Amino acid sequence: MGRTETGDESSARKMRRKVPTSIESLDADILCIIFSFLDLFDLVHCTVVCNSWNAVIKRLKLLQASCRKMHHLGSDSPSSSTSLDRPAEIDVEDFAMKHHKMALLRGRIEIERWEAHSHRVSQCRMKKGLLLTGVGDKVMRLWSLKSYKCMEEYSLPDASSLIDFDFDESKKLEVVSLAWEYFDSVVVVVVEIVGLVGTRISIWRRNGQRSIFPSRAGTFPKGLCMRYIDPEAVVGCEDGTARVFDMYSKTCSQIIRTQGGPITCLSLSDNQLFLSGSSLGRVTVSDPLMDQPVATLKSTITAGGIQTICFNQGTNLAFIGTTGGYVSCWDLRKMDRLWEKRVSPNVVYSIQQLRNDTSVMVAGGIDGVLRMIDQKSGRVLSRVIMDDKFSTTSTRNNQVVIEKRRGKRVSQDMEIDKIERKVRPQISCIAMGMKKMVTAHNGKCISVWKFNLS
């Protein structure tokens, strides 16, 4: 006869089943197997999850092995003149940026699209595996870029009330694991989202809870744009003022008069400087410590309003896109224009670059073409559109249907107007990631572009 299990043993077994596995308790051999499937960029992320993961990656020299693997993929891969066997001589960030650039310019392009909203939306923000979409619909939605699962919804009074939104990386809760493909129980939640709703600042917290700034402190003339870096949000207004709000005291701490016309776009820097673009074609550099603007940048070549501003923290260069299709580069240390080029026959809606990338940026606009642009010269290095062939598949939870396409590169002498509009929907917003980007199209669908060398 088989042994009969006692009640105490049965309870103990159930208790063991219910005890969650901590990431700290995973065996080094198991971690090694999991890490062997990750590329260099995911490995770098994993080094900062916890000390035990960092120790395993360093002890087994997994970063060096990944660098060697990428180095030997082919002659087009970024190379290094130093020995890859000596950890101290590997500049992982430099290697990653070179690989990122090569993927954007020469990699195979895979596109995954899904209907993210029931109404048109024009904006998207991406931070480390999370995507926030909205402006145009009655809700903002927070998505996982691994599973395309909608993790949270944030409701609005009405569809037309949300003008702009943002969230800060520092406001993310802990990540249980960054090896997303191998752990299904990952929970990543944005603690705080800041939105410009009508003439008020609103804050959404976990589970969609919304709070509004007090009437006296949070009301201002019509706001046209907003950016947020904890602890401040800056709102660009129709009357040409930029209003700085302290998110902790919920008060307007400063009003800066730019005298450059309605403010249409903003960009904030880590050192508290912010840039504002106007419909009159001026860019104003402001410092919250001063009541007056630091400088005003104005093109002598082009006319038209400023549509987008992208600031490179590492080089102190500002990239500016206009309604006339021009992109210009300004050195904020000298307040001098370095170059100005017309990259598109139509309005440029969005310019983005990776935070640490000093070589390539991406521009998109009304003609629906993604353009990879050299940051140093303004030369268009590559032009990308969608292929017209596609297939569909459902996510594991059947929450969304994914449309899969290939991207294709367009030669510089090809006339864009002769390409069908269905493969180049207008690009209203770009969110940039490592070897990937997300685009909104002022429609119901969101697109994820992935660039791979392998």
UniProtKB/Swiss-Prot annotation:
CDD domains registered for this protein in UniProt: F-box_FBXO41
Protein's UniProt keywords contain Repeat: yes
WD repeat coordinates: 85-116, 117-153, 170-214, 215-255, 258-296, 301-340, 343-383, 422-454
Every F-box domain range: 20-66
Keywords, in A-Z order: Repeat, WD repeat
InterPro entries named among the record's database cross-references: F-box-like_dom_sf, F-box_dom, FBXW2, WD40/YVTN_repeat-like_dom_sf, WD40_repeat_dom_sf, WD40_rpt
Keyword Repeat appears in the UniProt entry: yes
PANTHER family found in the cross-reference section: F-BOX/WD REPEAT-CONTAINING PROTEIN 2 (PTHR44436), F-BOX_WD REPEAT-CONTAINING PROTEIN 2 (PTHR44436:SF1)
Designated name of the protein: F-box/WD-40 repeat-containing protein At3g52030
Naturally occurring in which organism (per UniProt): Arabidopsis thaliana
